[in-house]
Amino acid sequence: MAPKKKVTGLIKLQIQAGQANPAPPVGPALGQHGVNIMEFCKAYNAATESQRGNVIPVEITVYEDRSFTFALKTPPAAKLLLKAAGVPKGSGEPHKTKVAKVTWDQVREIAETKKSDLNANDIDQAAKIIAGTARSMGITVE
């Protein structure tokens, strides 16, 4: 078995699916770790091609020899809620001004999508986490 490579950095970014390019914020974040920026952009865009229109968080592990691996996460709950509610952004005063409504079915659907990234044992707990996010954005859950 080959010896393990030493990890020198972990970079977390949220990039539009299929639209990674060397411009900020991607270029500077990767450049300071010595990663080949174009190589990452091509690999990320190829991996997220099917999810265009969503913001996909990515965790990039950089190794000593400047090679890297990356893991894709599920889209942020806030973005999924905004899409489900059909509004461009959440409320500036979430507990006073409500901007939209979502149903429990929509919340459960988002919880199903996010289950792998959430710290929940079952779908009901995951749905409550998503409902809390919705509440903090001024979206009513019915």
From Swiss-Prot:
GO terms for cellular component: cytosolic large ribosomal subunit. The keyword Isomerase does not apply. PROSITE patterns: RIBOSOMAL_L11. Keywords: Methylation, Ribonucleoprotein, Ribosomal protein, RNA-binding, rRNA-binding. One of its GO terms (molecular function) is structural constituent of ribosome. The keyword Magnesium does not apply. One or more lysine residues are methylated. Transmembrane segments: none annotated. GO terms for biological process: translation. It comes from the Bacteria. PANTHER family: 60S RIBOSOMAL PROTEIN L12, LARGE RIBOSOMAL SUBUNIT PROTEIN UL11M. NCBIfam families: L11_bact. HAMAP family: Ribosomal_uL11. Forms part of the ribosomal stalk which helps the ribosome interact with GTP-bound translation factors. Part of the ribosomal stalk of the 50S ribosomal subunit. Interacts with L10 and the large rRNA to form the base of the stalk. L10 forms an elongated spine to which L12 dimers bind in a sequential fashion forming a multimeric L10(L12)X complex. Belongs to the universal ribosomal protein uL11 family. This is Large ribosomal subunit protein uL11. It comes from Mycobacterium sp. (strain JLS).
